[in-house]
Regions:
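Post-HExxH zinc-binding segment in Zn-dependent metallohydrolases
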Residues: 99-135
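Extracellular/mature segments of secreted proteins
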Residues: 50-58, 109-112, 121, 145-150
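Sequence contexts marking disulfide-bonded cysteines in secreted/extracellular proteins
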Residues: 44-51, 101-103, 137-139
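Long, well-structured alpha-helical subdomains associated
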Residues: 122-156
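Substrate-binding clefts and substrate-entry loops adjacent to catalytic sites
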Residues: 64-71, 90-103
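Auxiliary, metal-adjacent structural segments of Zn-dependent hydrolase domains
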Residues: 1-63, 69-70
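Active-site recognition of the HExxH zinc-binding catalytic motif
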Residues: 78-91
């Protein structure tokens, strides 16, 4: 990814997020990395086939599938925007008051999809992002899972 074009795009996307939500612009832009789908599968799906196109991790930033055309395709750009919403959720601490990990995760995803679809609507594109629910195990009582989940990236 061309870094200067990427920074410009992120500033544009954070402005769009601010216009369709109550989030402020971030003090620091997250890092964005582009990986092949095979690397995404290795990192997130233990090598099994999966359809994750991007994810956010508070320590690593945003990781996107290298096949996404975030500079020219409005829907692909909205996928990056969705992950940038997760960055804002984390840096503002908006959902930290939700005690249940599962409830917090669901609320974060629902909001990110809502903002993504508002963005797509304003971009005058007919495509919309669909939230199909959580595909993984989520049990608040399972302490081992919760500890592991906090160190796992968010993928959509």
């Amino acid at each position: 990814l061309d870094q200067s074009a990427l920074v410009s795009l992120m500033v544009e996307l954070f402005t769009a997020i601010r216009l369709v939500s109550a989030y402020p612009a971030p003090a620091v832009l997250p890092e964005v990395h582009s990986f092949p789908q095979s690397e995404m599968r290795r990192r997130l799906c233990e090598g099994r086939p999966c359809s994750i196109k991007a994810y956010y991790h508070p320590d690593w930033g945003v990781v996107i599938d290298e096949t996404l055309d975030v500079h020219h395709d409005p829907f692909d750009r909205s996928i990056l925007l969705h992950e940038l919403v997760h960055h804002l959720q984390k840096t503002t601490g908006k959902f930290e008051v939700v005690a249940s990990f599962c409830s917090r995760r669901m609320a974060e995803e629902l909001e990110a999809y809502e903002i993504q679809n508002r963005y797509l609507s304003k971009a005058n594109t007919s495509r919309r992002a669909l939230f199909m629910g959580s595909t993984g195990k989520c049990a608040d009582a399972d302490e081992a899972f919760r500890a592991q989940a906090h160190s796992q990236p968010k993928g959509d």
